[in-house]
């Protein structure tokens, strides 16, 4: 069989996709479901589609109700209005695209495979037509499935970064061959706190800051928000990356509280703290993840605890191998704890795509918020599908988002080779008798003494 006689030079022709209507029907029946597979847009809702690329929204603060004025029998109170602080925020909405090509070499490989399928079918006494058609349908599905999958991954990244870092930075690491920019939210600087609970070394080893108390810190914040009727709120969600969560629950102060839960009498004597930590670690190992999350949620006073484990892939061209490699990126960054109102706190602003005329072959995606267009270059014998989806999750309650940057890098101390000058002025360290590194007080280099630089 010559596969060309069945019109297999075009996957669309074989499957009868020759108009926008038939393309839409095929997409809805096969690929539409992938638009929500693995999608994490918790706390978001789609805003109405718009024509321009500028997102605008208004943010208002709470209003404290004032008391009535007490006057004498014949006096009138002063008329007064109500002042509500309203802020206007603007953002630019970036466009994302995916391109899938199917060229002559791909077609030739396909025809070779189809001829093999035809021969096998004939040997078995079967009709080759169903085999060929199924092959084409699967090949098209696998090729175009990349489009909704990649848009889902990008949306996950935008949501995770905006919620976890209160901004999105696009660079060569996560958007190679695309634009480089930073999209900032309107979260006030005062809502962002750096309070290290642990540090991580280059080899992944974790060192806990024992003076920190993660549960107490978050508990005080959730309690303060519930009691603040002006800037606070009642229903509270705490969100963090899964890696952050499982690191935090092994903090000595957290293990201590878990141990006291098992043996409440330990709390009567301070010297029992270490025993409680040991007991807490044993309890931690025996608890299921779901039970642990529920206990932690209750301990910090949250109504909802979201543990984000979404991983997205970033493709980049390796300069040495000249091949594309995929790097894994945490959508919600590690080392951040977010305290926010439960429910919707973000609108996904989206721009209506400019649709071609009725002669073009295209399909709507993501409920009409994006499109996939089909092009065929007869001269180059190349089929191309290009998608367009313009969307950005924007924090619409930025003043209610509170961030704790809780992870740091473990310091490394490197010996100074042939030190000279003033060690103290140069910020050198020395090792104390207890093994700790402390800033030196030496103003002259002491013979036989080792000095260190901190990094």
Model-derived segments and their meaning:
Residues 1-56, 402-403, 411-413, 455:
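N-terminal alpha-helical "arm" segments
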Residues 40-123, 179-182:
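Assembly/oligomerization interface modules of large self-assembling protein complexes
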Residues 74, 101-103, 241, 288, ...:
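Helix N-terminus capping/helix-initiation residues
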Residues 87, 94, 101, 115, ...:
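A structural detector for beta-sheet-dominated domains
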Residues 91-191, 210-245, 381-388:
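Long, contiguous amphipathic alpha-helices that act as assembly "spine/axial" helices in icosahedral shell
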Residues 176-295:
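Extended, solvent-exposed, turn-rich assembly/linker loops in the middle of proteins
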Residues 255-439, 443-450, 454-455:
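Sequence/fold signature of self-assembling virion shell proteins
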């Amino acid at each position: 069989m010559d596969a060309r006689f069945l019109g297999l030079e075009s996957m669309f022709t074989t499957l009868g996709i020759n108009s926008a209507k038939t393309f839409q029907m095929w997409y809805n029946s096969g690929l539409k479901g992938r638009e929500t597979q693995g999608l994490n847009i918790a706390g978001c809702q789609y805003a109405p589609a718009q024509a321009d690329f500028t997102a605008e929204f208004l943010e208002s603060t709470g209003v404290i109700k004032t008391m009535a004025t007490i006057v004498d029998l014949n006096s009138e109170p002063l008329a007064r209005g109500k002042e509500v602080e309203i802020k206007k925020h603007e953002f630019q909405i970036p466009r994302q695209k995916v391109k899938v090509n199917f060229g002559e070499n791909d077609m030739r490989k396909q025809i070779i495979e189809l001829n093999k399928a035809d021969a096998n079918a004939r040997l078995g006494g079967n009709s080759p037509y169903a085999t060929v058609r199924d092959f084409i349908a699967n090949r098209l599905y696998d090729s175009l499935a990349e489009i909704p999958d990649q848009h889902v991954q990008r949306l996950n990244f935008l949501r995770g970064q905006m919620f976890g870092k209160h901004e999105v930075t696009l660079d060569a690491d996560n958007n190679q061959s695309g634009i480089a920019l930073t999209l900032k939210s309107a979260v006030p600087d005062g809502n962002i706190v750096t309070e290290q609970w642990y540090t991580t070394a280059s080899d992944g080893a974790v060192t806990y800051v024992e003076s920190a108390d993660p549960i107490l810190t978050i508990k005080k914040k959730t309690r303060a928000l519930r009691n603040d009727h002006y800037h606070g709120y009642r229903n509270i969600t705490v969100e963090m990356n899964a890696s952050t969560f499982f690191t935090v629950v092994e903090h000595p102060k957290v293990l201590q509280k878990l141990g006291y839960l098992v043996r409440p009498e330990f709390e009567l004597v301070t010297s029992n703290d270490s025993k409680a930590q040991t007991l807490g670690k044993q309890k931690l190992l025996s608890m299921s993840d779901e039970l642990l999350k529920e206990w932690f949620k209750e301990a910090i006073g949250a109504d909802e605890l979201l543990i984000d484990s979404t991983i997205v892939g970033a493709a980049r061209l390796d300069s040495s191998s000249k091949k594309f490699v995929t790097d894994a990126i945490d959508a919600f960054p590690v080392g951040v704890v977010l305290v926010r109102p439960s429910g919707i706190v973000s609108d996904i602003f989206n721009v209506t795509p400019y649709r071609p005329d009725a002669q073009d072959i295209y399909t709507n995606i993501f409920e009409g918020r994006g499109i996939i267009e089909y092009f065929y270059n007869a001269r180059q014998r190349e089929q191309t599908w290009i998608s367009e989806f313009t969307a950005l999750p924007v924090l619409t309650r930025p003043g209610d988002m509170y961030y704790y940057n809780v992870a740091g890098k473990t310091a490394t101390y490197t010996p100074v080779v042939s030190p000279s000058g003033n060690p103290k002025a140069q910020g050198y360290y020395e090792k104390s008798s207890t093994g700790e590194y402390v800033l030196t007080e030496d103003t002259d280099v002491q013979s036989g003494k080792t000095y260190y630089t901190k990094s």
